[in-house]
Protein backbone atom coordinates (compact mmCIF):
# COMPACT_ATOMS: atom_id res chain seq x y z
CA UNK A 1 0.00 0.00 0.00
CA UNK A 2 2.88 2.36 0.87
CA UNK A 3 4.50 1.81 -2.55
CA UNK A 4 1.20 2.45 -4.37
CA UNK A 5 0.77 5.71 -2.44
CA UNK A 6 4.31 6.81 -3.30
CA UNK A 7 3.71 6.06 -6.99
CA UNK A 8 0.50 8.13 -7.00
CA UNK A 9 2.28 11.03 -5.28
CA UNK A 10 5.11 10.82 -7.82
CA UNK A 11 2.66 10.87 -10.77
CA UNK A 12 0.94 13.93 -9.31
CA UNK A 13 4.24 15.70 -8.69
CA UNK A 14 5.80 14.99 -12.09
CA UNK A 15 2.68 15.50 -14.25
CA UNK A 16 2.90 19.34 -14.58
CA UNK A 17 6.30 19.06 -16.36
CA UNK A 18 5.16 16.85 -19.23
CA UNK A 19 4.46 19.57 -21.81
CA UNK A 20 6.24 22.53 -20.21
CA UNK A 21 9.39 24.38 -21.27
CA UNK A 22 12.38 22.07 -20.76
CA UNK A 23 15.71 23.24 -19.31
CA UNK A 24 19.04 21.44 -19.59
CA UNK A 25 22.04 22.11 -17.34
CA UNK A 26 25.55 21.42 -18.71
CA UNK A 27 28.50 21.29 -16.28
CA UNK A 28 32.11 21.36 -17.42
CA UNK A 29 35.04 19.53 -15.90
CA UNK A 30 37.74 21.35 -13.99
CA UNK A 31 38.73 19.52 -10.81
CA UNK A 32 37.96 21.34 -7.58
CA UNK A 33 36.83 24.37 -9.59
CA UNK A 34 33.72 22.33 -10.38
CA UNK A 35 32.50 22.95 -6.82
CA UNK A 36 31.24 26.21 -8.35
CA UNK A 37 28.44 24.15 -9.94
CA UNK A 38 26.83 23.53 -6.53
CA UNK A 39 26.30 27.26 -5.99
CA UNK A 40 24.71 27.56 -9.43
CA UNK A 41 22.28 24.72 -8.73
CA UNK A 42 21.36 26.24 -5.36
CA UNK A 43 20.64 29.64 -6.91
CA UNK A 44 18.49 28.09 -9.66
CA UNK A 45 16.48 26.04 -7.16
CA UNK A 46 15.91 28.97 -4.79
CA UNK A 47 14.57 31.02 -7.69
CA UNK A 48 12.29 28.22 -8.91
CA UNK A 49 14.19 27.66 -12.17
CA UNK A 50 13.66 24.06 -13.37
CA UNK A 51 16.46 21.61 -14.14
CA UNK A 52 14.98 18.89 -16.35
CA UNK A 53 18.15 17.33 -17.74
CA UNK A 54 21.79 17.39 -16.75
CA UNK A 55 25.03 16.50 -18.52
CA UNK A 56 28.57 16.82 -17.22
CA UNK A 57 32.18 15.82 -17.57
CA UNK A 58 34.71 14.95 -14.86
CA UNK A 59 33.90 17.09 -11.80
CA UNK A 60 30.78 18.20 -13.66
CA UNK A 61 29.82 14.52 -13.86
CA UNK A 62 30.27 14.11 -10.10
CA UNK A 63 28.12 17.13 -9.22
CA UNK A 64 25.63 16.35 -11.98
CA UNK A 65 25.26 12.71 -10.94
CA UNK A 66 24.69 13.60 -7.30
CA UNK A 67 21.93 16.00 -8.28
CA UNK A 68 20.52 13.50 -10.79
CA UNK A 69 20.20 10.81 -8.12
CA UNK A 70 18.37 13.06 -5.68
CA UNK A 71 21.00 14.98 -3.72
CA UNK A 72 20.15 18.55 -2.76
CA UNK A 73 22.84 21.28 -2.73
CA UNK A 74 22.95 20.90 1.07
CA UNK A 75 23.47 17.14 0.71
CA UNK A 76 26.28 17.69 -1.79
CA UNK A 77 28.04 20.21 0.44
CA UNK A 78 27.78 17.91 3.44
CA UNK A 79 29.28 15.03 1.46
CA UNK A 80 32.11 17.03 -0.10
CA UNK A 81 33.08 18.62 3.23
CA UNK A 82 33.18 15.30 5.07
CA UNK A 83 36.31 13.55 6.32
CA UNK A 84 35.20 10.55 4.27
CA UNK A 85 35.49 12.56 1.04
CA UNK A 86 39.03 13.68 1.96
CA UNK A 87 40.00 10.04 2.37
CA UNK A 88 38.42 9.13 -0.96
CA UNK A 89 40.46 11.54 -3.08
CA UNK A 90 43.65 11.06 -1.05
CA UNK A 91 43.50 7.26 -0.88
CA UNK A 92 44.05 7.25 2.89
CA UNK A 93 42.52 4.54 5.09
CA UNK A 94 40.90 5.07 8.47
CA UNK A 95 42.98 3.62 11.28
CA UNK A 96 40.17 1.30 12.38
CA UNK A 97 40.31 -0.41 8.96
CA UNK A 98 44.08 -0.91 9.02
CA UNK A 99 44.28 -4.59 9.96
CA UNK A 100 47.68 -5.06 11.58
CA UNK A 101 46.92 -8.76 12.00
CA UNK A 102 47.61 -9.31 8.29
CA UNK A 103 50.57 -6.97 7.96
CA UNK A 104 54.17 -8.12 7.97
CA UNK A 105 56.94 -6.59 10.03
CA UNK A 106 58.17 -3.50 8.10
CA UNK A 107 61.38 -3.88 6.10
CA UNK A 108 63.83 -1.10 5.12
CA UNK A 109 63.02 -1.37 1.41
CA UNK A 110 62.79 1.73 -0.79
CA UNK A 111 60.74 -0.12 -3.39
CA UNK A 112 60.08 -3.59 -4.74
CA UNK A 113 59.86 -5.07 -8.22
CA UNK A 114 57.16 -7.72 -8.62
CA UNK A 115 57.14 -10.43 -11.28
CA UNK A 116 55.73 -13.87 -11.99
CA UNK A 117 56.90 -17.03 -13.74
CA UNK A 118 53.39 -18.41 -14.27
CA UNK A 119 53.42 -17.27 -17.88
CA UNK A 120 56.22 -17.79 -20.36
CA UNK A 121 59.37 -15.71 -20.06
CA UNK A 122 58.30 -13.87 -23.23
CA UNK A 123 55.52 -12.25 -21.19
CA UNK A 124 57.84 -11.36 -18.30
CA UNK A 125 56.88 -7.82 -17.25
CA UNK A 126 58.19 -6.66 -13.88
CA UNK A 127 56.01 -4.05 -12.15
CA UNK A 128 57.36 -1.36 -9.89
CA UNK A 129 55.79 1.95 -10.99
CA UNK A 130 52.28 2.95 -9.80
CA UNK A 131 49.66 3.68 -12.48
CA UNK A 132 48.21 6.67 -10.63
CA UNK A 133 49.17 9.31 -8.08
CA UNK A 134 46.07 8.66 -5.96
CA UNK A 135 45.72 5.15 -4.55
CA UNK A 136 42.36 3.81 -5.88
CA UNK A 137 41.73 1.66 -2.79
CA UNK A 138 39.07 4.04 -1.40
CA UNK A 139 37.32 4.98 -4.65
CA UNK A 140 36.96 1.35 -5.73
CA UNK A 141 34.82 0.74 -2.66
CA UNK A 142 33.03 4.00 -1.96
CA UNK A 143 31.45 4.23 -5.42
CA UNK A 144 29.45 1.13 -4.47
CA UNK A 145 28.05 2.85 -1.38
CA UNK A 146 27.44 6.11 -3.21
CA UNK A 147 25.90 4.90 -6.47
CA UNK A 148 24.70 1.27 -6.23
CA UNK A 149 21.23 2.10 -4.86
CA UNK A 150 20.63 4.76 -7.51
CA UNK A 151 21.71 2.31 -10.22
CA UNK A 152 19.29 -0.28 -8.81
CA UNK A 153 16.47 2.25 -8.58
CA UNK A 154 16.81 3.39 -12.22
CA UNK A 155 17.60 -0.18 -13.40
CA UNK A 156 20.73 1.09 -15.11
CA UNK A 157 18.81 3.55 -17.29
CA UNK A 158 20.06 7.09 -16.62
CA UNK A 159 16.84 8.51 -18.12
CA UNK A 160 15.03 7.13 -15.05
CA UNK A 161 17.10 8.97 -12.46
CA UNK A 162 15.55 11.81 -10.47
CA UNK A 163 16.89 14.05 -13.25
CA UNK A 164 17.83 12.36 -16.57
CA UNK A 165 21.61 12.37 -16.81
CA UNK A 166 24.56 11.88 -19.16
CA UNK A 167 28.29 12.03 -18.59
CA UNK A 168 31.32 11.71 -20.84
CA UNK A 169 34.31 9.36 -20.65
CA UNK A 170 37.15 8.84 -23.12
CA UNK A 171 38.27 5.81 -25.10
CA UNK A 172 41.92 6.76 -25.70
CA UNK A 173 42.64 3.64 -27.78
CA UNK A 174 39.98 4.46 -30.40
CA UNK A 175 40.42 8.22 -29.86
CA UNK A 176 36.78 9.03 -29.20
CA UNK A 177 34.37 10.11 -26.49
CA UNK A 178 32.08 7.67 -24.70
CA UNK A 179 28.59 8.94 -23.88
CA UNK A 180 27.46 7.17 -20.71
CA UNK A 181 23.68 6.63 -20.96
CA UNK A 182 23.18 3.42 -19.03
CA UNK A 183 24.87 0.75 -16.96
CA UNK A 184 26.49 1.20 -13.56
CA UNK A 185 26.19 4.87 -12.58
CA UNK A 186 29.26 4.65 -10.36
CA UNK A 187 31.37 3.27 -13.22
CA UNK A 188 30.15 6.02 -15.55
CA UNK A 189 31.08 8.80 -13.13
CA UNK A 190 34.34 7.12 -12.10
CA UNK A 191 35.42 6.89 -15.74
CA UNK A 192 34.43 10.48 -16.44
CA UNK A 193 36.67 11.81 -13.63
CA UNK A 194 39.74 9.56 -14.15
CA UNK A 195 42.27 12.22 -15.12
CA UNK A 196 45.34 10.46 -16.59
CA UNK A 197 48.17 9.77 -14.11
CA UNK A 198 46.20 11.31 -11.24
CA UNK A 199 43.43 8.68 -11.02
CA UNK A 200 43.50 5.12 -12.29
CA UNK A 201 41.22 4.46 -15.31
CA UNK A 202 38.56 1.76 -15.15
CA UNK A 203 37.45 -0.84 -17.65
CA UNK A 204 33.91 -0.65 -19.03
CA UNK A 205 32.80 -3.26 -21.58
CA UNK A 206 36.45 -4.20 -22.22
CA UNK A 207 37.36 -0.57 -22.93
CA UNK A 208 39.79 1.33 -20.71
CA UNK A 209 37.90 4.55 -19.94
CA UNK A 210 39.57 7.82 -18.92
CA UNK A 211 38.50 11.36 -18.04
CA UNK A 212 35.87 12.66 -20.45
CA UNK A 213 37.62 16.03 -20.59
CA UNK A 214 40.20 14.56 -22.96
CA UNK A 215 37.71 14.79 -25.86
CA UNK A 216 34.68 16.71 -24.59
CA UNK A 217 34.92 18.77 -21.42
CA UNK A 218 31.62 20.62 -21.95
CA UNK A 219 28.99 18.26 -23.43
CA UNK A 220 26.42 20.69 -24.83
CA UNK A 221 26.24 18.54 -27.99
CA UNK A 222 25.20 15.52 -25.92
CA UNK A 223 22.55 17.62 -24.17
CA UNK A 224 21.10 18.71 -27.53
CA UNK A 225 21.28 15.30 -29.20
CA UNK A 226 19.94 13.22 -26.31
CA UNK A 227 17.42 15.50 -24.59
CA UNK A 228 16.46 18.31 -27.03
CA UNK A 229 15.80 20.92 -24.30
CA UNK A 230 14.15 24.23 -25.11
CA UNK A 231 16.99 26.11 -23.44
CA UNK A 232 20.44 25.25 -22.03
CA UNK A 233 22.20 26.72 -19.01
CA UNK A 234 25.95 26.12 -19.15
CA UNK A 235 28.56 26.41 -16.41
CA UNK A 236 32.21 26.52 -17.53
CA UNK A 237 34.97 26.45 -14.91
CA UNK A 238 37.78 25.34 -17.22
CA UNK A 239 39.63 26.52 -20.31
CA UNK A 240 41.48 24.88 -23.13
CA UNK A 241 45.12 24.13 -22.21
CA UNK A 242 47.42 27.13 -22.45
CA UNK A 243 50.94 26.97 -23.85
CA UNK A 244 52.92 24.54 -21.67
CA UNK A 245 55.53 25.94 -19.32
CA UNK A 246 58.97 24.47 -18.85
CA UNK A 247 58.61 23.88 -15.10
CA UNK A 248 54.87 23.09 -14.98
CA UNK A 249 54.36 19.33 -15.32
CA UNK A 250 50.55 19.55 -15.08
CA UNK A 251 50.30 22.01 -17.99
CA UNK A 252 52.54 19.72 -20.05
CA UNK A 253 50.32 16.71 -19.31
CA UNK A 254 47.15 18.68 -20.15
CA UNK A 255 48.59 19.69 -23.52
CA UNK A 256 49.60 16.12 -24.30
CA UNK A 257 46.27 14.47 -23.49
CA UNK A 258 43.45 17.05 -23.76
CA UNK A 259 41.83 18.03 -27.06
CA UNK A 260 40.32 21.44 -27.70
CA UNK A 261 36.77 21.83 -26.38
CA UNK A 262 34.11 24.25 -27.62
CA UNK A 263 33.03 26.10 -24.47
CA UNK A 264 30.39 28.24 -26.18
CA UNK A 265 26.59 28.20 -26.29
CA UNK A 266 24.87 30.25 -29.02
CA UNK A 267 22.64 32.97 -27.54
CA UNK A 268 19.65 31.48 -29.32
CA UNK A 269 20.14 28.17 -27.51
CA UNK A 270 20.80 29.23 -23.96
CA UNK A 271 22.74 31.01 -21.24
CA UNK A 272 26.45 30.59 -20.54
CA UNK A 273 28.29 31.32 -17.29
CA UNK A 274 32.09 31.26 -17.55
CA UNK A 275 34.39 31.33 -14.53
CA UNK A 276 38.13 31.94 -14.82
CA UNK A 277 40.35 30.64 -12.02
CA UNK A 278 44.12 31.11 -12.03
CA UNK A 279 44.89 30.06 -8.46
CA UNK A 280 42.68 26.99 -7.90
CA UNK A 281 44.41 23.64 -8.30
CA UNK A 282 42.96 20.30 -9.32
CA UNK A 283 42.59 19.10 -5.70
CA UNK A 284 41.68 22.35 -3.86
CA UNK A 285 38.51 20.80 -2.41
CA UNK A 286 38.98 22.55 0.93
CA UNK A 287 37.91 25.78 -0.82
CA UNK A 288 34.37 24.54 -1.31
CA UNK A 289 32.69 27.46 0.49
CA UNK A 290 34.56 30.05 -1.56
CA UNK A 291 33.90 28.33 -4.88
CA UNK A 292 30.25 27.63 -4.03
CA UNK A 293 29.68 31.30 -3.22
CA UNK A 294 31.28 32.43 -6.49
CA UNK A 295 28.89 30.23 -8.46
CA UNK A 296 25.89 31.25 -6.36
CA UNK A 297 26.58 35.00 -6.56
CA UNK A 298 27.21 34.95 -10.30
CA UNK A 299 23.94 33.11 -10.92
CA UNK A 300 22.00 35.50 -8.69
CA UNK A 301 23.51 38.46 -10.56
CA UNK A 302 22.22 36.96 -13.83
CA UNK A 303 18.85 35.87 -12.47
CA UNK A 304 16.80 38.57 -14.22
CA UNK A 305 18.27 37.50 -17.55
CA UNK A 306 17.68 33.84 -16.74
CA UNK A 307 14.06 34.43 -15.74
CA UNK A 308 13.41 36.43 -18.89
CA UNK A 309 14.49 33.41 -20.96
CA UNK A 310 12.82 30.75 -18.83
CA UNK A 311 9.16 31.41 -18.07
CA UNK A 312 8.41 28.12 -16.35
CA UNK A 313 8.76 27.88 -12.56
CA UNK A 314 8.96 24.95 -10.17
CA UNK A 315 8.17 25.11 -6.48
CA UNK A 316 11.16 24.34 -4.24
CA UNK A 317 9.00 22.53 -1.69
CA UNK A 318 7.64 20.42 -4.52
CA UNK A 319 11.21 19.53 -5.59
CA UNK A 320 12.09 18.55 -2.02
CA UNK A 321 9.05 16.31 -1.79
CA UNK A 322 9.81 14.68 -5.15
CA UNK A 323 13.38 14.15 -4.02
CA UNK A 324 12.23 12.51 -0.79
CA UNK A 325 9.81 10.23 -2.67
CA UNK A 326 12.47 9.24 -5.20
CA UNK A 327 15.17 8.42 -2.65
CA UNK A 328 12.75 6.57 -0.39
CA UNK A 329 12.44 3.97 -3.16
CA UNK A 330 16.16 3.17 -3.08
CA UNK A 331 16.65 -0.54 -2.28
CA UNK A 332 18.57 -1.09 0.94
CA UNK A 333 22.20 -2.11 0.41
CA UNK A 334 22.16 -5.75 1.60
CA UNK A 335 24.40 -8.36 -0.02
CA UNK A 336 23.98 -12.09 -0.38
CA UNK A 337 25.73 -13.82 -3.29
CA UNK A 338 29.41 -13.21 -4.09
CA UNK A 339 30.69 -13.64 -7.65
CA UNK A 340 34.47 -13.41 -8.04
CA UNK A 341 36.42 -12.87 -11.24
CA UNK A 342 40.21 -13.29 -11.41
CA UNK A 343 40.67 -16.02 -8.80
CA UNK A 344 40.63 -19.82 -8.83
CA UNK A 345 38.08 -21.79 -6.72
CA UNK A 346 40.45 -22.14 -3.74
CA UNK A 347 41.24 -18.42 -3.78
CA UNK A 348 37.54 -17.61 -4.08
CA UNK A 349 36.81 -19.68 -0.97
CA UNK A 350 39.50 -17.76 0.95
CA UNK A 351 38.12 -14.39 -0.21
CA UNK A 352 34.47 -15.20 0.53
CA UNK A 353 35.25 -16.10 4.15
CA UNK A 354 36.26 -12.48 4.75
CA UNK A 355 32.66 -11.34 4.11
CA UNK A 356 30.36 -14.07 5.43
CA UNK A 357 30.57 -17.56 6.91
CA UNK A 358 28.07 -19.23 4.54
CA UNK A 359 26.87 -18.69 0.98
CA UNK A 360 23.26 -17.92 1.92
CA UNK A 361 23.99 -15.49 4.73
CA UNK A 362 23.26 -11.82 4.08
CA UNK A 363 25.76 -9.12 4.99
CA UNK A 364 25.82 -5.32 5.07
CA UNK A 365 27.96 -2.65 3.45
CA UNK A 366 29.89 -2.33 6.70
CA UNK A 367 30.70 -6.07 6.52
CA UNK A 368 31.82 -5.52 2.92
CA UNK A 369 34.02 -2.61 3.98
CA UNK A 370 35.68 -4.58 6.78
CA UNK A 371 36.35 -7.61 4.56
CA UNK A 372 37.58 -5.44 1.70
CA UNK A 373 40.22 -3.70 3.78
CA UNK A 374 41.22 -6.95 5.50
CA UNK A 375 41.93 -8.59 2.15
CA UNK A 376 44.01 -5.63 1.00
CA UNK A 377 46.00 -5.38 4.24
CA UNK A 378 48.55 -8.00 3.18
CA UNK A 379 50.46 -8.42 -0.08
CA UNK A 380 48.36 -11.18 -1.65
CA UNK A 381 45.86 -9.03 -3.55
CA UNK A 382 46.82 -5.81 -5.33
CA UNK A 383 43.31 -4.56 -6.12
CA UNK A 384 39.65 -5.43 -5.63
CA UNK A 385 37.02 -3.70 -7.75
CA UNK A 386 33.54 -4.33 -6.29
CA UNK A 387 30.18 -3.91 -8.02
CA UNK A 388 26.70 -4.34 -6.61
CA UNK A 389 24.04 -5.86 -8.89
CA UNK A 390 20.47 -5.69 -7.59
CA UNK A 391 18.16 -8.73 -7.46
CA UNK A 392 14.53 -7.52 -7.28
CA UNK A 393 13.33 -11.06 -6.49
CA UNK A 394 14.77 -11.12 -2.97
CA UNK A 395 15.69 -7.40 -2.73
CA UNK A 396 19.37 -8.11 -2.14
CA UNK A 397 22.48 -7.33 -4.16
CA UNK A 398 24.96 -9.70 -5.74
CA UNK A 399 28.49 -8.60 -4.90
CA UNK A 400 30.73 -8.88 -7.96
CA UNK A 401 34.44 -8.71 -7.15
CA UNK A 402 37.08 -8.24 -9.82
CA UNK A 403 40.24 -9.41 -8.08
CA UNK A 404 43.79 -8.71 -9.20
CA UNK A 405 46.32 -10.91 -7.42
CA UNK A 406 49.83 -9.69 -6.77
CA UNK A 407 52.64 -11.34 -8.71
CA UNK A 408 54.18 -14.24 -6.81
CA UNK A 409 57.77 -13.01 -6.70
CA UNK A 410 59.20 -9.71 -5.49
CA UNK A 411 62.73 -8.32 -5.32
CA UNK A 412 63.08 -5.79 -2.50
CA UNK A 413 65.74 -3.08 -2.51
CA UNK A 414 66.66 -0.55 0.13
CA UNK A 415 69.32 0.75 2.44
CA UNK A 416 70.95 3.84 3.88
CA UNK A 417 73.76 6.06 2.57
CA UNK A 418 75.64 8.14 5.11
CA UNK A 419 78.93 10.01 5.53
CA UNK A 420 79.41 8.10 8.79
CA UNK A 421 79.87 4.38 9.30
CA UNK A 422 76.11 3.63 9.22
CA UNK A 423 75.91 2.78 5.50
CA UNK A 424 73.58 -0.09 4.82
CA UNK A 425 72.34 -2.13 1.84
CA UNK A 426 69.11 -4.13 2.01
CA UNK A 427 68.18 -6.88 -0.45
CA UNK A 428 65.31 -9.36 -0.28
CA UNK A 429 63.54 -11.96 -2.38
CA UNK A 430 60.00 -13.06 -1.53
CA UNK A 431 57.48 -15.57 -2.83
CA UNK A 432 53.78 -15.67 -2.01
CA UNK A 433 50.78 -17.75 -2.99
CA UNK A 434 47.07 -17.68 -2.20
CA UNK A 435 44.78 -20.73 -2.15
CA UNK A 436 42.61 -21.96 0.72
CA UNK A 437 45.18 -20.21 2.87
CA UNK A 438 47.79 -17.50 2.26
CA UNK A 439 51.46 -18.33 2.44
CA UNK A 440 54.55 -16.18 2.07
CA UNK A 441 58.30 -16.83 2.15
CA UNK A 442 60.95 -14.12 2.46
CA UNK A 443 64.73 -14.39 2.37
CA UNK A 444 66.40 -11.05 2.98
CA UNK A 445 69.50 -9.52 4.42
CA UNK A 446 71.38 -6.35 5.23
CA UNK A 447 75.04 -5.58 4.64
CA UNK A 448 76.80 -2.67 6.26
CA UNK A 449 79.67 -1.35 8.31
CA UNK A 450 78.21 -2.07 11.74
CA UNK A 451 75.15 -4.27 11.19
CA UNK A 452 74.92 -7.40 9.01
CA UNK A 453 71.96 -9.74 8.92
CA UNK A 454 70.52 -12.69 6.99
CA UNK A 455 66.97 -13.85 7.71
CA UNK A 456 64.41 -16.35 6.46
CA UNK A 457 60.70 -15.96 7.21
CA UNK A 458 57.79 -18.26 6.37
CA UNK A 459 54.19 -17.27 7.12
CA UNK A 460 50.85 -19.04 6.68
CA UNK A 461 47.48 -17.33 7.28
CA UNK A 462 44.27 -19.32 7.72
CA UNK A 463 40.96 -17.54 7.05
CA UNK A 464 38.94 -19.51 9.61
CA UNK A 465 36.19 -18.43 12.02
CA UNK A 466 39.02 -17.15 14.20
CA UNK A 467 41.74 -16.10 11.72
CA UNK A 468 45.11 -17.52 12.68
CA UNK A 469 48.62 -16.76 11.48
CA UNK A 470 51.73 -18.96 11.89
CA UNK A 471 55.15 -17.44 11.35
CA UNK A 472 58.60 -19.07 11.45
CA UNK A 473 61.75 -16.91 11.54
CA UNK A 474 65.42 -17.91 11.37
CA UNK A 475 67.96 -15.11 11.71
CA UNK A 476 71.73 -14.57 11.88
CA UNK A 477 73.03 -11.13 12.89
CA UNK A 478 76.48 -9.64 13.40
CA UNK A 479 77.28 -6.29 15.04
CA UNK A 480 80.80 -4.96 14.38
CA UNK A 481 81.54 -1.93 16.58
CA UNK A 482 85.06 -1.28 15.30
CA UNK A 483 84.99 2.03 13.39
CA UNK A 484 86.88 2.48 10.12
CA UNK A 485 86.97 5.32 7.64
CA UNK A 486 86.18 3.53 4.36
CA UNK A 487 82.54 3.03 3.50
CA UNK A 488 81.47 -0.63 3.31
CA UNK A 489 85.09 -1.70 3.84
CA UNK A 490 85.60 -5.22 5.19
CA UNK A 491 89.43 -5.33 5.20
CA UNK A 492 91.57 -5.75 8.31
CA UNK A 493 88.63 -6.52 10.54
CA UNK A 494 89.81 -7.07 14.14
CA UNK A 495 88.56 -10.01 16.18
CA UNK A 496 87.24 -7.94 19.03
CA UNK A 497 84.32 -5.63 19.79
CA UNK A 498 81.84 -7.80 17.90
CA UNK A 499 78.49 -9.42 18.74
CA UNK A 500 76.86 -12.39 16.99
CA UNK A 501 73.18 -13.27 17.37
CA UNK A 502 71.33 -16.34 16.08
CA UNK A 503 67.75 -17.29 16.77
CA UNK A 504 64.86 -19.49 15.65
CA UNK A 505 61.34 -18.37 16.46
CA UNK A 506 57.81 -19.75 15.97
CA UNK A 507 54.94 -17.27 16.40
CA UNK A 508 51.17 -17.67 16.44
CA UNK A 509 49.13 -14.54 15.70
CA UNK A 510 45.47 -13.82 16.41
CA UNK A 511 43.32 -10.75 15.74
CA UNK A 512 42.86 -8.57 18.81
CA UNK A 513 40.52 -5.58 19.38
CA UNK A 514 39.23 -5.53 15.78
CA UNK A 515 42.27 -4.20 13.90
CA UNK A 516 45.07 -5.11 16.33
CA UNK A 517 47.21 -8.25 16.57
CA UNK A 518 48.12 -10.50 19.48
CA UNK A 519 51.18 -12.75 19.13
CA UNK A 520 52.42 -15.74 21.10
CA UNK A 521 55.80 -17.24 20.37
CA UNK A 522 58.49 -19.66 21.37
CA UNK A 523 62.09 -19.54 20.27
CA UNK A 524 65.70 -20.43 20.85
CA UNK A 525 68.58 -17.97 20.58
CA UNK A 526 72.31 -17.70 21.00
CA UNK A 527 74.19 -14.46 21.66
CA UNK A 528 77.99 -14.36 21.57
CA UNK A 529 80.14 -11.32 22.40
CA UNK A 530 83.69 -11.16 21.04
CA UNK A 531 86.03 -8.63 22.65
Description of each model-found segment:
Residues 5-8, 203-206, 389-395:
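Short, ordered beta-strand-loop transition motifs
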Residues 366, 371, 377, 383-531:
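Gram-negative/organellar outer-membrane beta-barrel architecture
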Residues 4-17:
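Sec-dependent N-terminal signal peptides
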Residues 15-17, 34-35, 52, 224, ...:
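Solvent-exposed, well-ordered amphipathic alpha-helical segments
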Residues 19-57, 65-373, 377-384, 388-389, ...:
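Patatin-like phospholipase
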